[in-house]
Amino acid sequence: MSARGQDIVSIIKEQIKEFGAPVSMTSVGSVIEVGDGIARIHGLSNAKYNELLEFPGGVLGIALNLEEDSVAAVILGEDSNIKEGDEVKATGRISEITVGKGMIGRVVDPLGRPLDGKGPIKAESTRPLERIAPNVVDRKSVNTPVQTGIKAIDAMIPIGRGQRELIIGDRSTGKTAIALDTIINQKGGDLVCIYVAIGQKASKVARIVALLEQYGAMEHTIVVAANSSDAVALQYLAPYAGCAIGEEFMEQGKDALVVYDDLTKHAWAYRQLSLLLRRPPGREAYPGDLFYLHSRLLERAARLNDKLGGGSLTALPIIETQAGDVSAYVPTNVISITDGQIYLEPDMFNAGIRPAVNVGISVSRVGSSAQTKAMKKVAGKLKMDMGQYRELAAFAQFGTSELDKSTRMQLERGQRVTEVLKQGQYQPVPAAKQVAILYATLNGYLDNIEVGKVRDYESGLYRFLEANFASVLTAIAKENVISADTEKTLKTALDEYKKGLVV
């Protein structure tokens, strides 16, 4: 062989050695049927449950039914361009979402894609949407309050960090308002809030985002939105996405709050998906695993023990009832999963008692362990007293002339407490001020005030305390206890305010 020929051979050998094309294997199938947001695919025999699939044009889908000779997938986008015979690739990734601090202040869809036009999100990491809930050993008892800023709730139905408290009521009774007030009240605090909008109108979600921005709440809030015009599969995934975002903060030792608005629409979306996937229907055409749908979501809310960082994820699911029927299928399911419920009554709402919390049906199973000692001291008997007042008020409709003096006094005080517990929307009250007004009410300082002037008394008291006795409010807020000295100063303040009051 000539020298030139040897040179060519050596060059070829060198190039062969340097050649290192990466070898990859992709599982590919083909669409055999498509329609109503569902695609049946042949050939993806190794597909996993909840695996992301890629359709032509970059449209994603999720494998939900793994059958003997095909896979049924829900399409997470527009399906009009997908046709029979199209190639489908398995991505090998389980459905996931970007998580981390970069999400705060953003509006995203359930796959973490931004919807607010503020550019791409700086992702710190990703998390799977579905995850097994923390077990009993990993948890810690709930003993730190989530201050909602709503007097009726903080005093009588306290919510703790790591609790799951259901907000339930008919349409237009103020369910979303309670959740938004709670988010707004966390301004300047350490609680990261996630608001999940499921099947809402895009205009309503835009209004909520604008409202949160107006009150400075988007600085600690993430909005996950799957609108009514979006694919039903996105509505099904939305709460799990919100939960995954919250879990990231919980596992970093921080506290997070997630609002699911609302799980009734989530159940409807799952029913629609299940029927399209030809799963056998059960009661009210819901699939048989409807309870598991919500239990596996809500069980992920927890307070972790100190070894795991002591973080927490609090859940506020919302359920819409029809004509006050709390015993319907979806409401009873969620009531049995959660640690209590706040029931909003249409009659109270229409009578101007807002928030329209029905104290008799509402309950917090965590109870006073999620209250500060100061609130516990002033509101200890309030729930029972209000329950008794409601019974007496119903009885007194037949006339009060024959009632004894103590019963009449109880009715009078009950009317004043009801007025004190009324509150305007988006006007959360700090915990120290709540303690002050409840102390005044339950110790008879409002007994001589006309019922119609109670709200004026309350707003005047707040201004008076801020101007002349700010140290009392500071002491209650810092110590979370009404010490003997603080109580003495508070009594002095209330006496002075009463003297200067023109009734």
Curated annotation (Swiss-Prot):
Spell out the protein name for this chain.
ATP synthase subunit alpha
> Which HAMAP family does this UniProt record tie to the protein?
ATP_synth_alpha_bact
Subunit structure of this chain's protein: F-type ATPases have 2 components, CF(1) - the catalytic core - and CF(0) - the membrane proton channel. CF(1) has five subunits: alpha(3), beta(3), gamma(1), delta(1), epsilon(1). CF(0) has three main subunits: a(1), b(2) and c(9-12). The alpha and beta chains form an alternating ring which encloses part of the gamma chain. CF(1) is attached to CF(0) by a central stalk formed by the gamma and epsilon chains, while a peripheral stalk is formed by the delta and b chains.
Any matching Pfam family: ATP-synt_ab
Q: What is its EC number?
A: 7.1.2.2
Q: Does the keyword Cell membrane apply?
A: yes
InterPro entries, per database record: ATP_synth_asu-like_sf (IPR023366), ATP_synth_asu_C (IPR000793), ATP_synth_asu_C_sf (IPR038376), ATP_synth_F1_a_nt-bd_dom (IPR033732), ATP_synth_F1_asu (IPR005294), ATPase_a/bsu_AS (IPR020003), ATPase_F1/V1/A1_a/bsu_N (IPR004100), ATPase_F1/V1/A1_a/bsu_N_sf (IPR036121)
Q: Which reaction does it catalyse?
A: ATP + H2O + 4 H(+)(in) = ADP + phosphate + 5 H(+)(out)
Q: Which organism is it from?
A: Dehalococcoides mccartyi (strain ATCC BAA-2100 / JCM 16839 / KCTC 5957 / BAV1)
**Feature type site, description Required for activity:** S362
In the bilayer, the protein is annotated as:
Peripheral membrane protein
PANTHER family given in the database record? ATP SYNTHASE SUBUNIT ALPHA, MITOCHONDRIAL
Location(s) in or outside the cell:
Cell membrane
Kindly give the NCBIfam families that the UniProt entry links to this protein: atpA (TIGR00962), PRK13343.1 (NF009884)
Query: Which family is this protein grouped under?
Result: Belongs to the ATPase alpha/beta chains family.
Say yes or no: keyword Chloroplast present. no
Lineage, uppermost ranks: Bacteria, Bacillati, Chloroflexota, Dehalococcoidia, Dehalococcoidales
